Structures are given as C-alpha cells and as structure tokens.
A protein has these predicted regions:
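Helical cap/lid subdomain of alpha/beta-hydrolase-fold lipid enzymes
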Residues: 81-201
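Short amphipathic alpha-helix
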Residues: 20-21
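Serine-dependent carboxylesterase/thioesterase catalytic core
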Residues: 5-11, 16, 25-138
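A short, charged/proline- and glycine-enriched loop
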Residues: 1-3
Length: 201
C-alpha cells in the first residue's frame, strides 16, 4: 500500500494552490489528498480542532505524512502536537510562520487587513499567544522557507518595499520566523511566499 500524505493549503487559498505538489507526490507513488478548509472563517484553535476531527474520521492505514503551506503548516503542528489522532510519519512545513509574521504584527489590526484575511490574522502576529502555546509534534519535521521578497501579483510585496528593508523574508514571513525548535532540517529557496508551492525545487 502507498504511503499516505495529507496536504493543507494556506490562508486565503484553496487546494488548487497545492495541486502541483499533490500531483508530484502522486507521481512519486504516494497516496496524496488535500484537506480543504474555510481558512478565513475560524481562528487558529478552531482550524486545529476541525482538522483533528477530520483526521479522526479518516480510515488511514499506517503512518500519515503531512505537508502544509503557511497557515496549513501551523494547523498541522497544532493538531499533531498533543495526543495526535493518527500515527505520524514525517511533516514538511512550507513558509509557515512558526514565530508569527512581522507584517501581521504591523498591519493586522487595520480593518482592511481583517476584512481581507479573516479571523486567523489575530493569531499570526509575532509571538502571538496562540502560536506560542502550540507544542511540537514528535516526528521528523522539515522546514522550507522562501527568500524572494517581491512578486508583482502579491499586494503585500508592495507594502514590504517600505517596511522590511534589511530582513530576510519571503514577502510575508521572515526567514527567522519560519524556524521551529525541534525541527529536523531547514532549507531556504529563492521563492515568494504566495507561490512557493509551485517552485521547481
């Protein structure tokens, strides 16, 4: 039987944003599926509990691997940190703000920000209590971070032109803030936060 992989997309995205990853995993022989969730409509704790409940309803045979982009990686981390509902294989977190995102700390309270990005924004600022209270799953965890600051199709890129000079970041999350104590490995690639899942590497 093929190893099973569950993918989670990021905030404001859909499973289409990780479709290339999913196809690549399937070509490699994995049984891959994506959990689709209404990313703007719940705070972080609500997403974590919804994902845990979804996992409990699945009939997985053997350990399950997980791949999460941005918020998706944080949800995976929270759902699997304590008494995980399934046997865990490996975890890959792609551009996930484990220590929060500075741009959220600076602009997350603005009404337009919450209108666009929804409820989770309250929990994704640097050192937010919701993030700092999360544990770390007992599993091999790989972190992939991006280093491309600007993409013309990403609105936050234009904000960052004036507010993030001198920092290594992917246009949304600082490189340092993707890191997680207890992670097995970490790499950084020349990719922008929003489009990192389509990067050739």
């Amino acid at each position: 039987m093929s190893d099973q992989v569950v993918l989670l997309h990021g905030l404001g995205r859909s499973c289409a944003s990780v479709a290339r990853l999913q196809s690549g995993l399937e070509e490699m022989g994995f049984a891959a599926l994506c959990w689709s969730y209404p990313s703007r409509r719940r705070r972080l704790a609500g997403h974590i509990e919804a994902f845990r409940e979804w996992l409990r309803r699945q009939a997985f045979a053997g350990p399950v691997h997980f791949v999460g982009h941005s918020l998706g990686g944080i949800i995976i981390r929270g759902a699997l940190a304590d008494t995980p509902p399934v046997a865990i294989g490996r975890i890959v977190m792609i551009a996930s703000p484990n220590q929060g995102a500075g741009v959220v700390s600076r602009f997350g309270r603005w009404p337009f920000s919450r209108a666009i990005f929804g409820l989770p924004l309250q929990d994704l600022g640097e050192k937010s209590p919701a993030l700092m209270s999360l544990g770390v799953p007992e599993a091999e965890i790989g972190i992939i971070a991006g280093l491309r600051h600007f993409h013309p199709l990403n609105a936050i890129s234009y904000v960052n032109l004036f507010h993030r000079a001198g920092h290594q970041h992917d246009g949304t999350v600082e490189l340092a803030n993707t890191q997680l104590e207890g992670a097995t490995d970490s790499i950084a690639i020349d990719a922008h936060h929003t489009f990192i899942c389509d990067h050739d590497e």
